[in-house]
């Protein structure tokens, strides 16, 4: 079970939003590369990065910041936000990304996702962001008519490395992960699922260790880490089943 610390990039800075609304951005670090290294030093083994400007614009915007992150950390990095073409995917993977996350294009052009999975095995994840059970696109600014499981099932057997499932209503507001919807998705498909949106406390970390959550690959944490609501050492000890984990 992996805990992915999150770096969301807006105008070259590390920020957190509430419900995906750019107007609610709180700046946590103006040096994303330093933040990436700090997460590595705390013991995390992966890094989740989102180009927020890119998600809204439909093309990579914070490329310089992502490049600096890749140089600063030895941890594998997954990136989403504004990645729409095979050429972009190839470019980012050549620059050192461990995997790319395709969101809007997974709805608009699912065949491109399948092509990407064939071209770059194990390097392509799908981001499914939902509000009220329906998939949202274009930086969460537009709603679609697609259901979460309906979209996920389109990629069964395609070679998708993981599905990152975000409940927009819970994102950035520390209300706890939508465990019911997340576990329902994990049980509906064979693709590994990563939970995102709302992780709030050590209680959520403990919840990740429960038997019904074992189909998950992990969860993403942003604001709870930045605000100190989750202690990295304690969280990682719990997930790794180490004796020093607190009950």
Swiss-Prot record:
GO terms for biological process: L-histidine biosynthetic process; L-tryptophan biosynthetic process. One of its GO terms (molecular function) is 1-(5-phosphoribosyl)-5-[(5-phosphoribosylamino)methylideneamino]imidazole-4-carboxamide isomerase activity. One of its GO terms (cellular component) is cytoplasm. The active site is at 8 (proton acceptor), 129 (proton donor). Keywords: Amino-acid biosynthesis, Cytoplasm, Histidine biosynthesis, Isomerase. It comes from the Bacteria. It holds the Pfam family His_biosynth. This is 1-(5-phosphoribosyl)-5-[(5-phosphoribosylamino)methylideneamino] imidazole-4-carboxamide isomerase.
């Amino acid at each position: 079970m992996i805990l992915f610390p999150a770096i969301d990039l807006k105008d070259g800075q590390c920020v957190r939003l509430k419900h995906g609304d750019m107007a609610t951005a709180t700046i946590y670090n103006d040096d994303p590369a330093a933040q990436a290294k700090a997460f590595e030093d705390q013991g995390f083994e992966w890094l989740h990065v989102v180009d927020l400007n890119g998600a809204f614009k439909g093309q990579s915007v914070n490329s310089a910041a992502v490049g600096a992150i890749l140089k600063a950390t030895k941890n594998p990095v997954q990136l989403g936000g504004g990645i729409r073409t095979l050429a972009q995917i190839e470019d980012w993977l050549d620059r050192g990304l461990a995997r790319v996350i395709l969101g809007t294009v997974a709805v608009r052009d699912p065949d491109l996702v399948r092509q990407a999975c064939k071209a770059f095995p194990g390097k392509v994840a799908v981001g499914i962001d939902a509000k009220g059970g329906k998939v949202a696109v274009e930086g969460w600014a537009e709603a679609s008519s697609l259901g979460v499981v309906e979209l996920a099932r389109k990629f069964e057997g395609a070679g998708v490395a993981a599905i990152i499932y975000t409940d927009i209503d819970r994102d950035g507001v520390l209300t706890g992960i939508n465990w019911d919807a997340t576990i329902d998705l994990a049980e509906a498909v064979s693709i590994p699922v990563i939970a995102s949106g709302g992780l709030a406390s050590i209680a959520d970390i403990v919840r990740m260790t429960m038997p019904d959550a074992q189909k998950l690959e992990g969860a993403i944490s942003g604001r709870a880490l930045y605000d100190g609501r989750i202690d990295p050492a304690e969280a990682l000890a719990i997930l790794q089943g180490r004796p020093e984990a607190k009950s």
